[in-house]
Structures are given as C-alpha cells and as structure tokens.
UniProtKB/Swiss-Prot annotation:
Phylogenetic lineage: Viruses, Duplodnaviria, Heunggongvirae, Uroviricota, Caudoviricetes
Protein name: Photosystem II D2 protein
Top-level EC class as recorded in UniProt: oxidoreductase
GO biological process: photosynthetic electron transport in photosystem II
EC number: 1.10.3.9
Organism: Synechococcus phage S-WHM1
C-alpha cells in the first residue's frame, strides 16, 4: 500500500470568487451582479433623492420635488439646462467644479440617473444570459429584454444626442413623460410615424395575444379536481399536460377558421410581436433624433389652405401640432424668450 503525499491543487482567487458569485442563493449575484446591483442602487437612489429634494427652477423654471409641494405624479428628476449641451456633467467637471449643490442645480442628477440606469438595464440583461447559461436553458429572456433596453437608450440617450442638448430628453417623472409625449407629437407628428404605428401594433398585439393565450388555457384545463377552483389540482411535478391543445385548436379553428397547432410556434409568436414592437418604436425614435419627418400629405394641406370648406383629420392634426408648438415652446423653453405674435398663431378653417 502506497500513501499519497500529493496535495490537492491550489485554487486561485479568481476561481474562489467565481464560485462565490455563482453560488446558489436566494438572490443570485453572478458576475452580472457586479454591474447590475451598484448601478441600479445608484440610479434608483438618485431618482428618489432628486424627486424628494432637488428643484428644477434653474433648468426648467419648475418646481419638481416633494420638498417644493409636488406629488408622486408631478415630481421628477429634470433634464439639465439647455446651455449644458451634451456634457456628462460630472461632479468634478468644469461645470460644477466639485460643488454638489451647483451640480444638482445644473441638472447633474439627471445625467447620473440616466447613465447608471442604462448600465443597470444592461446588467439585468446580462444577468438573464448568465443564469440561463448556468441552468442550461436558452437565452430568449435576455433577447426579449433587449426591447426595453432599446426603448430606454433610444428615448433617454439617443434622441437628445440628436438634438441640441440633454434638455430635450424626457425628465424622470410621470407628468414629465407626458410632457415629452406632447412634445414628440407637436414637433415630430409622432403618431403618424409608421414606426410608432408598428410599436403600437406590437405592444397592444402582445397584450391581446397574452389575454387570448391565458383564457384559452383556462378554458381547456382538464377536469382533474373536485373544487370550482382548479389551481390546487395542479402539481408542478405531474407528467401529463394540464390543458388540452387539441381542444384549443378546435375552438379557434371554429372561431377564425385558423389556429395554432404548434405550441413552440405559438409561444415564439407571443415573444416576437411585443419585442418587435419595442424594437421598431426605438428605430422610430432614432429617426426623430435625426429630425426625419413622418408622412406628409402636402396635397391635402394645400387644398385645405385654398378651400375653407375642405378639411380632413390629417389637416386638423397638423393645425393641432402647430398649436402645440406655438403654446408649448414658450413655456417649455423659457430660456429662449419666445414671443409669437397673434397673426402667426394657428387657426382652424372654421375661424
């Protein structure tokens, strides 16, 4: 008998750290967590701080914090002043020079929340990739989450980068987002943009598919319990199906004359529709950043200008957009000191 004197191979610090990060725990950390948790913490903390204490008086001429009397719907972390351009507004940068209060007054907190928020979303996507790899499933969760990331990055970062400054990005607040929607309509005619139309079709179509799928499964559950509530009859370890795909197919074939017969294709379609809606709307926002125009039906505008009795919903919307620009711009951009004389303000044909 020979006694072995070989010692087990030593493990480096990287292997030890890798094991610790990937350990099975209540809240998975992983390598992606090194990006996700700090950035998400700082973004959410920055937003809570801004909506609680920080004014927008110096950037927008507005009260935007709980301290000033705003509520949950009207509080916001507002975009930096237009004069700041596309500066990263670092606390130690030339604008603030290390003065924390001045940094808040200039809108530095918005850049802080936007950039950390973007990296937090990317970290969450990487988290889904990492966990899918570890437990051996496909990465479609992460691929689908690219939709919300595309929307956030295009709306909060790429759109203002195409405009004159961060000022024209949405501020982080409920009413602030509504203001941004009105701005997009008035200055870009966003609702007539085909990419917006595809986005609406994708999001509402995804909601419709989700509702149809849910009720179809509920309608075709096997009668495997004694109670009216069927939830308790389900066992997560059961081998047999819990609902009848054949019956569902028969039902929708009679309703529409066509139905899904392949569960895999059905669920891919449910993934594809809303994610494609998010992607297409993001492409449209990038177009707006470059000031690309939506559909222009010039012939209708010319005829409406020549014929007081001719008006379409399109020409009416064009006048509404002119009104939005004329009355929104002086309030939205007080630093420009816009003054529009009465004769240039839009009027409907009926006037």
């Amino acid at each position: 008998m020979v006694a072995s004197t070989l010692s087990p191979p030593t493990r480096g610090w990287f292997d030890v750290l890798d094991d610790w990060l990937k350990r099975d725990r209540f809240v998975f950390v992983g390598w992606s967590g090194l990006l996700l948790f700090p950035t998400a913490y700082l973004a959410i903390g920055g937003w809570l701080t801004g909506t609680t204490f920080v004014t927008s008086w110096y950037t927008h001429g507005l009260a935007s914090s709980y301290l000033e009397g705003a509520n949950f719907l009207t509080a916001a972390v507002s975009t930096p002043a237009d004069s700041m351009g596309h500066s990263l507004l670092l606390l130690w940068g030339p604008e603030s020079q290390g003065d924390f209060v001045r940094w808040l007054q200039l809108g530095g907190l918005w850049a802080f929340v936007a950039l950390h928020g973007a990296f937090a979303l990317i970290g969450f996507m990487l988290r889904q990739f990492e966990l899918a790899r570890l437990i051996g499933i496909r990465p479609y969760n992460a691929i689908a989450f690219s939709g919300p990331i595309a929307v956030f990055v295009s709306v909060f970062l790429l759109y203002p980068l195409g405009q004159s400054s961060w000022f024209f990005a949405p501020s982080f607040g409920v009413a602030a987002i509504f203001r941004f929607l009105l701005f997009l309509q008035g200055f870009h005619n966003w609702t007539l943009n085909p990419f917006h139309m595809m986005g609406v079709a994708g999001i509402l179509g995804g909601a419709l598919l989700s509702a149809i799928h849910g009720v179809t499964v509920e309608n075709t559950l096997y009668e495997d319990g004694e109670q009216a509530n069927t939830f308790k009859a389900f066992d997560s370890t059961q081998e047999e199906e819990t609902y009848s795909m054949v019956t569902a197919n028969r039902f929708w074939s009679q309703i529409f004359g066509i139905a899904f017969s392949n569960k895999r294709w059905l669920h891919f379609f449910m993934l594809f529709v809303p994610v494609m809606g998010l992607w297409t709307s993001s492409i449209g926002i990038i177009g707006l950043a470059l000031n690309l125009r939506a559909y222009d039906f010039v012939s209708q505008e010319i005829r409406a200008a020549e014929d007081p009795e001719f008006e379409t919903f399109y020409t009416k919307n064009i006048l509404l957009n002119e009104g939005l620009r004329a009355w929104l711009a002086p309030i939205d951009q007080p630093h420009e000191n816009f003054v529009f004389p009465e004769e240039v303000l839009p009027r409907g044909n009926a006037l």
